[in-house]
Structure formats: structure tokens, C-alpha cells
Amino acid sequence: STPIARYIYTTGTSTGKRVQALGGAKNHMVIMPDADLDMATNALMGAAFGSAGERCMAISVAVPVTDKVADALVEKLVPKIEALKIGPSVDPSAEMGPLITSEHLNKVTGYIDEGVNEGAKLVVDGRNTKPSMQGYENGYFIGGSLFDNVTKDMSIYKNEIFGPVLSVVRAQDYNSAVDLI
């Protein structure tokens, strides 16, 4: 986050050290027309939803090149995201755990609300996901969410959500995909 990056920068530079601190990230994966879509889909599942999306290097934006690739990618992602088993760490079959705090859960669900309000297509909605085991209903669980037709002026594109939300931004050619990065 930006406050943490400022803290690291201030602390480091106050001792005369050179510091470079990146406080936020929107990591993109470009999927070209000749890509192996099964491989790309599997890579996206781990990169976007591993650690409940709460890691600095999570892929939060998929950039398929051409609408044909975008449509096929979304079609492959939907059943995989819907099948994610969400649960506590004591459930060995759980594929994704809870978010870290209730405040963060509210932040992530707020971004999903914003995405819908700004006109992105919510293809998979993870907001009402229940955990895999009884007794954990008060945890901060959220399932994977997938947006399509996201544009670079939307808050879900511009801001780091730091949660299990994947945005699909369609590009018509390689150069326009690279321009997004």
C-alpha cells in the first residue's frame, strides 16, 4: 500500500540509504491469439486467486488480444472460478482461504460494487460465497470474482484491489495490449 511504501521510504532514507518502494501494483497478463488457452487459464487461476489475491505480484488484469480470444478465455475461466473451494486452512481440500480482516473484505466487496456500477460485466460474483466447513461462517470469506469488458477508466482497473478479483480488459492487437501495461 502507499502508506507502507512511504513508511519504508522515509525510514530507509532517514538513515542515508537509497530506497525504491513500490506501494501498489496492477499486474497484467497478455494472452495472444496463438496462446495455449488451457495453459493460460490454469496460470491465471493460480496467479489471480492464489493467496486469495492478497499478494503484491498477483495478476489482477487479463489482457486477451482480440475478442475471439477474450470470449474463449472467459468461457474457460468461469467454471474454474466457480469451482474454487473456499475454506479455512484446517480444510485440506480448500483452495482459497479468507481475506485478512473484515475491513479488507468490505473494501474488496466495495470494489466489486464499483465495477458493476461503472459498467463492467460481472461474470462470476464471489461476494456471497460460504466457507467449505461448518463453524467458520463468521470468517472473511469471499469467492473469486471475474469482470469482463473492463476499461482503463474504471476504478477496478486503476486501483489495486488486493483480493480475488480478476478483470478482463480486451485489446484488439498486441500494441494496444502493451500500451495498457
Question: Which stretches of residues belong to each language-model region?
Answer:
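Glycine-rich nucleotide-phosphate-binding loops and adjacent flexible coil segments
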Residues: P164
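Active-site donor-binding acidic/aromatic loop of nucleotide-activated sugar
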Residues: S167-V169
